[in-house]
């Protein structure tokens, strides 16, 4: 009786190579579905995967078929009403749709079926932040920020079929078969020599010759039963993500929590900052994040207070910029740090304070930061703060500003602000 033993440690993932091929082939449709799904998520839902839906028209394989209409001779098997050369009345509608034509009319236009499948958290985040990077990152003398890159790392006994090493697997197969059959082959050679000697001897020893032939046949059968290749022989190319030293960086997150920021606006700002936090923590190992909340006064807070504190008040945006400048001078030397900032506000500010914000950014902050992004979340017309910042955008290349009106704008704006730029890396 033959026994088959499944030694695969990753047997449940035996279709992983097909899954990866599918994700690569339909990446554009999947990314579009993810950009739509992220707007439906809870602000704090970052640990789960995502159900992705793709229109079936996008994944159908092309095929040739008979067009509708025209004259054709066709005999449908199994019918008891028609024979060859009978004329069948053309259905109403000619070459129209494929429906039965018996339903009620609809004004909703075309519909489409969708193919729905689940992607894991890692696949979700990889697609979410693909082709994004911190702009203008410079390598400084003291390197503490690690960016992970994939490198070959020898061979492993587990993996997906796409990474199998044929040469190394066959080498292991040969070594195993040699080790397992070496003793039997020596014994086989000895028996064959004895058989040859007995067959030449006089008188002929028929019983002994028959015994030797039987033992030789048994040994050969045992040798042949050793499988040509076994799961133990398989070796896969191993890849691992290694941290590559880069520059140390700090991200300042400045959020307006004044009374003019209603709960919906604050939720959109939090969504933007959660995306930013996930992007930084997934792409880079060591990035300092400084959280600053402000109304009439600014305060440096921890992550929990930044996202969940209910404190509110009036609006003086310059208080946050002043605090950021103080923190930079106290803890982050621009010669040693890549400094970034992301500011979110509804644009409502005390009118006399907006020129001061322009002055602080132009003279103190923008000259020392690598990149400064401003996001205005409002459906109203832009006010003095936006107009002051427009002058900065025209003057400084490291200043960017975007307008968010609805929740659907958050992810496209985020990608626009942090898309990977093709520029020469600075030493």
Curated annotation (Swiss-Prot):
Signal peptide interval: none
Biased composition (Basic and acidic residues): 77-90
Region annotation Disordered: where it falls in the sequence: 72-109
TM segment ranges: none
Protein origin, superkingdom: Bacteria
Biased segments, Gly residues type: 92-102
Family: Belongs to the UPF0229 family.
The protein's name in its UniProt record: UPF0229 protein KPN78578_11640
Species of provenance: Klebsiella pneumoniae subsp. pneumoniae (strain ATCC 700721 / MGH 78578)
């Amino acid at each position: 009786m033959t026994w088959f033993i499944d030694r695969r440690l990753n047997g449940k993932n035996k279709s992983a190579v097909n899954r990866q091929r599918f994700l690569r082939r339909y990446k554009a449709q999947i990314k579009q579905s993810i950009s739509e799904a992220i707007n439906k998520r809870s602000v704090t839902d970052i640990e789960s995967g995502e159900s992705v839906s793709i229109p079936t028209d996008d994944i159908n394989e092309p095929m040739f078929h008979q067009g509708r209409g025209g004259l054709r001779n066709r005999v449908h098997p199994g019918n008891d009403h028609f024979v060859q050369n009978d004329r069948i009345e053309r259905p109403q509608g000619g070459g129209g749709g494929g429906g039965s034509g018996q339903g009620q009319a609809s004004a909703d236009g075309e519909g489409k079926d969708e193919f729905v499948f689940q992607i894991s958290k890692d696949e979700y985040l990889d697609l979410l932040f693909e082709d994004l990077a911190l702009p203008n990152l410079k390598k400084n003398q003291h390197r503490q920020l690690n960016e992970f890159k994939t490198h070959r790392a020898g061979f492993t006994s587990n993996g997906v079929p796409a990474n199998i090493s044929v040469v190394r697997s066959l080498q292991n197969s040969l070594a195993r078969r040699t080790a397992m059959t070496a003793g039997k082959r020596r014994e086989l050679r000895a028996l064959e020599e004895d058989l040859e000697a007995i067959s030449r001897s006089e008188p002929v020893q028929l019983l002994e010759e028959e015994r030797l032939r039987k033992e030789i046949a048994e040994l050969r059968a045992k040798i042949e039963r050793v499988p040509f290749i076994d799961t133990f022989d398989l070796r896969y190319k191993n890849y691992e993500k290694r941290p590559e030293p880069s520059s140390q960086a700090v991200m300042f997150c400045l959020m307006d929590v004044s009374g003019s920021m209603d709960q919906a606006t604050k939720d959109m700002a939090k969504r933007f900052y959660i995306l930013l936090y996930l992007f930084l923590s997934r792409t880079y190992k060591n990035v300092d994040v400084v959280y600053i909340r402000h109304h009439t006064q600014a305060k440096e807070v921890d992550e929990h207070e930044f996202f969940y504190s209910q404190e509110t008040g009036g609006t003086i945006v310059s208080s946050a910029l002043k605090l950021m400048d103080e923190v930079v001078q106290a803890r982050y030397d621009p010669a040693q740090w890549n400094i970034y900032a992301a500011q979110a506000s509804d644009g409502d500010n005390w009118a006399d304070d907006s020129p001061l914000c322009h002055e602080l950014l132009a003279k103190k902050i923008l000259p020392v930061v690598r990149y400064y992004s401003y996001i205005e979340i409002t459906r109203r017309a832009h006010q003095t703060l936006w107009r002051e910042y427009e002058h900065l955008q025209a003057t400084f290349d490291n200043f960017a500003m975007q307008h968010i009106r609805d929740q659907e704008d958050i992810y496209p704006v985020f990608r626009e602000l942090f898309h990977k730029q093709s520029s020469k890396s600075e030493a």
